[in-house]
Design a protein with these regions (language model features):
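Conserved, mostly hydrophobic/aromatic
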Residues: 7, 48, 69, 101, ...
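Active-site gating/metal-coordination segments in enzymes
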Residues: 54-55, 63-148, 152-155, 192
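Catalytic pocket-lining loop regions of alpha/beta-barrel enzymes
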Residues: 108-109, 122-225
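Short, acidic/polar
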Residues: 37-47, 90-102, 183
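Histidine-centered catalytic micro-motifs
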Residues: 3-12, 141-144, 175
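Mid-to-C-terminal alpha-helical segments outside catalytic/metal-binding sites
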Residues: 1-9, 16-51, 55, 221-223, ...
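A structural motif corresponding to the C-terminal end of an alpha-helix
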Residues: 47-54, 76, 136, 167-171
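Active-site environment of divalent metal-dependent phosphoester hydrolases
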Residues: 11-13, 63-65, 89-92, 146-150, ...
Length: 269
């Protein structure tokens, strides 16, 4: 069994800790000690090897990239690549920062988190980011579903992505952190748009709803990709629970590996 983990954090011990993140770690996930720790290179590689994870996509900020995170990619470029958080409210600063990190580092994904910017994905300031992602041939993830932290959840309704997919048909758009409680809507949108996908970061496989499992086994075999959000959820736990899902032959490998490989690591890039 092989896997690509599309959402991994290694510097949560030293990174800034906003109040909402502290509260969600303590009240929602109840594992603040495990979440707020830095993970060393050797430790992360051991976790990946035990889990069968060949590559991890590490998160960092586009405007202020962490040297700690970058050191993982420099040491083991065969095992680590990057996803860059972008704050669209920063206007052209954000656009130029995204272009810079894409040019200088192994960035394979951009990220926007609506609840963190208190804006919907349809906000005008987001559109230059989407256009730049198309220009750079860079997929982008947008958090969907009610967030665990005590922060506005309304901006993470997947319905906002209907307009984005329609306006930017060349954009590879990935819903991140599942889509609870809007699973049916998320599935319907993925059926409607070829350029829309979903990663299951921060959502334990044992809690996947029946409609998602059905979609993965049928028309959505090429749409759903694995991610843990380690250490928020343990990588080992998520891989183990994924292997226990009631999936048809060949679907588990697509979920754990092939879909992410195709969308995030195209051979032509």
């Amino acid at each position: 069994m092989r896997a690509i983990d599309a959402f991994v954090n290694v510097n949560m011990g030293s990174a800034e800790r906003p109040d909402y993140l502290v509260r969600v770690a303590e009240d929602y996930f109840k594992r603040s000690e495990q979440i707020f720790k830095d993970i060393g290179l050797d430790e992360m590689l051991e976790i990946m090897d035990r889990s069968g994870v060949e590559k991890s996509i590490l998160s960092l900020r586009a405007e202020t990239p962490s040297e700690q995170v970058l050191s993982f990619c420099k040491a083991r470029p065969d095992r680590f690549v990057l996803a860059a958080y972008v704050d669209p409210r920063r206007g052209m600063h954000a656009v130029r920062a995204l272009e810079r990190v894409r040019r200088e580092y192994p960035v394979v994904l951009a990220r926007i988190v609506p609840f963190m910017i208190d804006l919907p994905p349809t906000a005008p300031c987001c559109y230059p980011i989407y256009a730049k992602c198309i220009e750079l041939d860079l997929p982008i993830s947008v958090n969907t579903g009610i967030p665990g932290p005590p922060a506005p959840g309304k901006w993470q309704d997947p319905m906002y992505l209907d307009e984005i997919c329609l306006f930017f048909p060349e954009l590879k758009l990935i819903m991140a952190h599942g889509a609870d409680p809007w699973w049916q809507l998320a599935i319907r949108l993925m059926l409607k748009y070829k350029n829309l996908y979903l990663m299951t970061s921060a959502y334990a496989p044992r809690y996947f709803p029946a409609e998602l499992i059905h979609f993965m086994n049928t028309r959505g075999q090429d749409k759903i990709m694995f991610a843990s959000d380690h250490p928020v959820l343990s990588m080992e736990r998520c891989v183990k629970e994924a292997a226990e899902l009631d999936l048809r032959d060949g679907v588990l490998d697509k979920f754990l590996y092939t879909n992410a490989e195709r969308v995030l690591f195209p051979k032509s890039r």
